[in-house]
């Protein structure tokens, strides 16, 4: 279990210490579950009333909240960001693998940097290049001539097809597949003729990809994921998609082929985005958005009907289904009124 003096933690977090710096911090916890040795954080003033009941040894908070502190405190401008950084310092997550497992199959032509770990039953094919401190979890497959940059980690059962490039300090969760064939077919009088997918997937640095996500290889050009992109679980990213730096994609999103998304975008969960078009920088699509046309202006975009009581929704749906008839009737009434005038 990691531990650190509160004063040392404050220094690493560039926080202002109030209280005993010799307190030993052993973990991060919520305000409700924290006990002695824990540090917690408060991001909303409405939780001030809970400080009196909180058992944490220290609390991260803003200057405005400091008068309400009942324990040692670290004062910062952004408690949530500080929480993320202190959680990294006190992280107890094990590595996906340690050392080279005896059952790992590593081709003689593969190149491994220093301090590489490969888990049980993983397969590393010919021509693969693994940078320093790369960790390959149990049961992973890394296809021919693929490259994985220094410090990147693959959890168990990740599949990386041939000729894929993954940058430095990336994290890929279990059962994700990178570089499978895109959905490319030509129609010959009702019969589907497969188009070999000859492109690659290029993933930048500091990219994180959730579990059970699929990113298809390009048909001719490459599928490209920019630096700092974060992608949640169970997303489908089709061939030739390009995602700009630092864009966030929530769970269950489906992106059709040849879509280009700009930088600093946020795509809400279960959204569906049409292909062969562009979305500009700094666009937010709220959950379950259906994006059928290009977006050329930054901003927040929504579609769909929010949840309603069933009876209300049925009435709304009935009105929508009859909107064409209502429009025709309204136009007829307008013509009659105009004639009377």
From Swiss-Prot:
Protein origin, superkingdom: Bacteria
Enzyme class: transferase
EC number(s) on file: 2.3.1.191
One BP annotation, GO: lipid A biosynthetic process
An annotated Gene Ontology molecular function: N-acyltransferase activity
Pathway assigned to this chain's UniProt record: Glycolipid biosynthesis; lipid IV(A) biosynthesis; lipid IV(A) from (3R)-3-hydroxytetradecanoyl-[acyl-carrier-protein] and UDP-N-acetyl-alpha-D-glucosamine: step 3/6
Active-site positions on this chain: 239
InterPro entries assigned: Hexapep, Hexapep_transf_CS, LpxD, Trimer_LpxA-like_sf, UDP_GlcNAc_AcTrfase_non-rep
Reactions that this protein is recorded to catalyse: a UDP-3-O-[(3R)-3-hydroxyacyl]-alpha-D-glucosamine + a (3R)-hydroxyacyl-[ACP] = a UDP-2-N,3-O-bis[(3R)-3-hydroxyacyl]-alpha-D-glucosamine + holo-[ACP] + H(+); UDP-3-O-[(3R)-3-hydroxytetradecanoyl]-alpha-D-glucosamine + (3R)-hydroxytetradecanoyl-[ACP] = UDP-2-N,3-O-bis[(3R)-3-hydroxytetradecanoyl]-alpha-D-glucosamine + holo-[ACP] + H(+)
Pfam families linked: Hexapep (PF00132), LpxD (PF04613)
GO CC term (a single one): membrane
SUPFAM superfamilies, per the entry: Trimeric LpxA-like enzymes
Entry keyword set: Acyltransferase, Lipid A biosynthesis, Lipid biosynthesis, Lipid metabolism, Repeat, Transferase
Similarity section: Belongs to the transferase hexapeptide repeat family. LpxD subfamily.
Classification via PANTHER family: UDP-3-O-ACYLGLUCOSAMINE N-ACYLTRANSFERASE, UDP-3-O-ACYLGLUCOSAMINE N-ACYLTRANSFERASE 1, MITOCHONDRIAL-RELATED
HAMAP family: LpxD
Assembly with partners or alone: Homotrimer.
Function: Catalyzes the N-acylation of UDP-3-O-(hydroxytetradecanoyl)glucosamine using 3-hydroxytetradecanoyl-ACP as the acyl donor. Is involved in the biosynthesis of lipid A, a phosphorylated glycolipid that anchors the lipopolysaccharide to the outer membrane of the cell.
Protein name as catalogued: UDP-3-O-(3-hydroxymyristoyl)glucosamine N-acyltransferase
Gene (name only): lpxD
